Regions:
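Conserved class I S-adenosyl-L-methionine
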Residues: 2-54
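Class I SAM-dependent methyltransferase SAM/SAH-binding core
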Residues: 58-114
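Short glycine-dipeptide loop
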Residues: 152-158
Length: 223
């Protein structure tokens, strides 16, 4: 693990504060196993297939969680260049340890601010299950695409997934759980819908694609 630099280490958003070491210890089975499959109705296999379709050998993971999907994905090269970027140190440390065999470089930064890191650009950037935790609606959240775009090579792809509130089929558990998460400010997606996501992506990227699986939008766009 190469600890390249620390930027904006203060964690003030509830969506970040929720990711404690204890939470991360049960995150894979509770959130990715139960919630994603039964409540959001987007099985992990769909996310993994999306990863494998877009992952490059020169990759930046943003909002790293526990590294679950990267750990189960297949890079197109034996020795990929992998970087991890997150505001939460707990997430960075857990994921870097899990993916230590790739010797990832880690960056601690707030993607809501311009990202001032000195690094060669990447061929792929993933923003998986991050947007629904960011404050505001897509006109405000969309600035993260502007901040990440300079980190992509020409032709590079930004992809990811986010849980939407509007324009998706939400069953009773999804409505109740989403309301609770928004009340606790772990989520901030009460105004998030597909049209808003598409508009935010198209403002900064080309060849934008958005597909819905349950309550989840799988999205991609290129520089």
């Amino acid at each position: 693990m190469v600890d390249a630099m620390e930027i904006s280490p203060d964690i003030t958003n509830q969506g970040q504060i929720a990711f404690t070491k204890n939470t991360l210890a049960v995150y894979d089975w509770m959130v990715l196993g139960l919630a994603c499959h039964l409540i959001w109705r987007c099985p992990n296999e769909r996310i993994l297939a999306f990863y494998r379709a877009h992952l490059s050998g020169n990759h930046l993971e943003v909002g790293v969680g526990t590294g679950f999907f990267l750990d189960r994905s297949t890079f197109p090269t034996v020795q990929p260049r992998l970087a991890l970027l997150d505001l939460n140190r707990n997430c960075l440390e857990r994921t870097a340890q899990r993916l230590a065999h790739y010797q990832p470089t880690i960056y601690q930064a707030n993607i809501l601010n311009p990202i001032e890191i000195q690094t060669p650009a990447f061929n792929s950037v993933c923003l998986n299950y991050v947007l629904h935790c960011l404050p505001g609606s897509f006109p405000e959240k969309g600035k993260v695409f502007a901040h990440l775009r300079p980190l992509l090579k020409p032709g590079g792809v930004l992809f990811g997934a986010t849980v939407l509130h509007g324009g998706v089929q939400r069953n009773a558990p999804a409505r109740l759980f989403m309301r609770w998460l928004n009340t606790r400010q772990v989520f901030s997606n009460a105004r998030d819908d597909r049209d808003g996501l598409v508009a935010a992506l198209e403002q900064h990227l080309s060849d934008v694609q958005v597909h819905l699986v349950g309550c989840v939008a799988l999205f991609s766009g290129r520089v």
